[in-house]
Regions:
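Short, small-residue-biased leader/transition segments that mark boundaries at the very start
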Residues: 2-6
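Glycine-rich phosphate/diphosphate-binding loop of Rossmann-like nucleotide-binding domains
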Residues: 9
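Glycine-rich hexapeptide-repeat left-handed beta-helix
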Residues: 12-13, 18-206
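Terminal amphipathic alpha-helical/low-complexity segments used for targeting or macromolecular assembly
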Residues: 129-434
């Protein structure tokens, strides 16, 4: 059973529709695959691989010859896979969580990094897969990249909260393994590479260069430096999260206890990670499964499905293995060499990163309550009436649900970090007394 699939006035040819997809309002599609919870209305899809939560709602939107997931396609968004030479032979990838603004356009082949915002027309075949959470914006017929800018966007965080709530699958046997995490080995590995790339650009082109060239895009000097800072904050947040999860609620009375809590619990996890249309998994594990299938002619689909489910269940254990593998690079120590003092420093770095990113979200949300945002209110009244109308509809900034959530998140995470620091300081005192 594929769950609830709506097919009202939809024209489809040679398509596979996953669980809880919603297709309606004269949508047309051919030669395409839709994973679960996709929503498609009014527009058109031609030869696409639509991962979970691919959403296109507008009559003028075309998705063609691309791989997408967790996509929000704006009205008039389209791509071209034909350069009028050898036919429609080109294709592209827009990695998970990206948004295309109204009238955006990409000339395939191209590759866009995870959780990116695409605005304007891009015809020079950019590859921004190494720069997740970025803005890709056209200005003066050039593609400008703003690395990491989406990390401080309210919209990105709201999307991450909405996706799990919008899982409409009713079948207890959920066919797609979906990991909703914004920060994972998959995105953090790209940020680490991004930091190296951005620092390399500074060294090769000079720190005072006004602009830098990267994969058919232009990065402004200020954007490059902010990108390094944002990626660094995100890595601190992710690494700290992983360590705190390991020690949360876990009593330890001496150093041996502490290191026992930090031991690896899965042999898999090192190396590159990939996004298999919702399933975030180590690449080597998938390669091993492919080798098993090739070497076993009697292999069944059920066995492969069991493999995917097992990888999904083991995610956090494999994630910890990956985190430990990059500790020498990030902290200069292996996990078994971490002292209580080291962990206290890591937790403080984590707390600073969490609060810094949350304050950026807070400031981003405030823009929605600015004077410019009030222009559409009040119809024909005075400024005072306009402000009154705005407040009746939108409420006050401090009372906004998202703003309250950000403030509470800062409080909760600070308390969580302080609780662990207190326990570690008590351990240090205990060790020194002996």
């Amino acid at each position: 059973g594929l769950g609830d699939v709506y097919k009202r006035q939809v024209v489809m040819s040679r398509c596979f529709i996953g669980q809880a997809c919603h297709l309606t309002h004269l949508f047309s599609a051919h030669d395409s695959l839709f994973f679960s919870n996709c929503q498609s209305e009014n527009g058109e899809a031609c030869a696409i691989f639509a991962g979970p939560y691919t959403v296109t709602m507008h009559k003028s939107s075309l998705l063609i010859a691309g791989m997408f997931s967790f996509l929000n396609a704006g009205s008039g968004s389209n791509q071209s896979n034909h350069m009028y030479k050898l036919g429609p032979i080109h294709q592209g990838v827009v990695e998970r969580g990206s948004k295309t603004t109204s009238d955006s356009y990409i000339l395939w082949p191209a590759k866009v990094g995870a959780f990116s915002l695409i605005m304007g027309r891009h015809v020079n075949h950019p590859d921004t897969s190494g720069m997740p959470f970025s803005y890709l914006i056209e200005h003066g017929n050039r593609s400008y990249l703003v690395p990491g800018a989406n990390l401080k966007s309210v919209g990105t965080i709201r999307d991450a909260q909405k996706w799990p709530k919008r899982d409409k699958r009713t079948d207890p046997d959920k066919l797609d393994c979906i990991n909703f995490n914004l920060l994972s080995p998959y995105t953090i590995q790209k940020m680490l590479q991004g930091i190296d790339t951005l620092q390399g650009l500074k060294q090769t082109s000079g720190e005072t260069s006004e602009c830098y060239s990267f994969q058919s895009t232009t990065i402004k000097n200020s954007s490059l430096n902010k990108g390094i800072d944002l990626y660094t904050l995100a890595v601190h947040k992710f690494m700290g999260n992983s360590i705190i999860k390991r020690l949360e609620g876990a009593p330890f009375s001496d150093l041996n206890d502490l290191h026992d809590r930090l031991k690896l619990t899965d042999s898999l996890g090192e190396g590159e990670w990939i996004d298999l249309s919702g399933l975030i998994v180590p690449k080597q594990a998938v390669k091993d499964e492919i080798d098993r299938i090739v070497g076993n002619p009697d292999s069944t689909l059920e066995e492969t499905e069991s493999f995917f489910q097992a990888m999904h269940r083991r995610y956090y254990d494999m994630e910890w293995t990956w985190v430990c593998s990059i500790m020498p690079r990030w902290y200069g120590k292996t996990v078994d060499r971490l002292s209580p003092g080291d962990i206290i420093r890591i937790v403080r770095q984590w707390n600073e990163a969490v609060v810094s990113l949350d304050r950026m979200l807070y400031d981003d949300a405030r823009k929605e309550f600015s004077m410019i945002s009030r222009i559409g209110f009040g119809v024909d009244g005075s400024t005072r009436q306009r402000d009154f109308d705005f407040e009746q509809v939108r409420g006050e900034f401090e009372n906004d649900a998202f703003v309250k959530m950000v403030c509470k998140h800062i409080e909760d995470k600070t308390a969580l970090g302080n609780e662990l620091i207190d326990r570690l300081e008590a351990l240090i005192t205990s060790i020194s007394q002996h």
